[in-house]
């Protein structure tokens, strides 16, 4: 993901790639041949940076995002697995720069979350199936969690799960806000996919989004890099930047 972000930033006429961080390839040139990869964000000269993009893991992101706040640098964060306590800390820390945390930077995925929120009041039952590559370490995905939250906020009249017996424990998935069930699939060959299934008397509605490769996230990431300076504090989701 980091290489794809570097390439997208370098290809954008309004952005300049000034640094990259990856302990596994420190000392090498980045995938665009523009900058030498650093071992740690502490090795980056903060005076050269306006915006930092973080796609790591939650533990590393906590340190990287705090570094941005400490140096007055805007942060665009796509790392999943962050907790509500992290958001509280970030809101307190970002006083001289801004931070965007988004569960998904694919425009279609952002629209899917909005459509699910719109549909929620009209259907008493719903379930989410999220499918990702087999290197994803957290479940459910951040996109699924955000979708659940928005659906639960849009309606409080969800039907109860009728299942009384699970022959295999956990076969009904996990239970999210509003009692909505969520199922996580991890398979080789996948990138990032999500289905939201709604049901009511005599009809169903299925919303689905598929990211077929990582290029699907790049337009959202470069948009965020260019717009984050106009959104004070901590913003959750790409919705505000898209005006939806």
Which residues are covered by each model-predicted region?
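C-terminal substrate-binding/catalytic lobe of Rossmann-fold NAD(P)-dependent oxidoreductases
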Residues: 2-46, 124-244
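Conserved NAD(P)H cofactor-binding loop of Rossmann-fold oxidoreductase domains
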Residues: 56
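Rossmann-fold NAD(P)-binding glycine/threonine-rich loop
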Residues: 59-74, 78-101, 106, 110-119
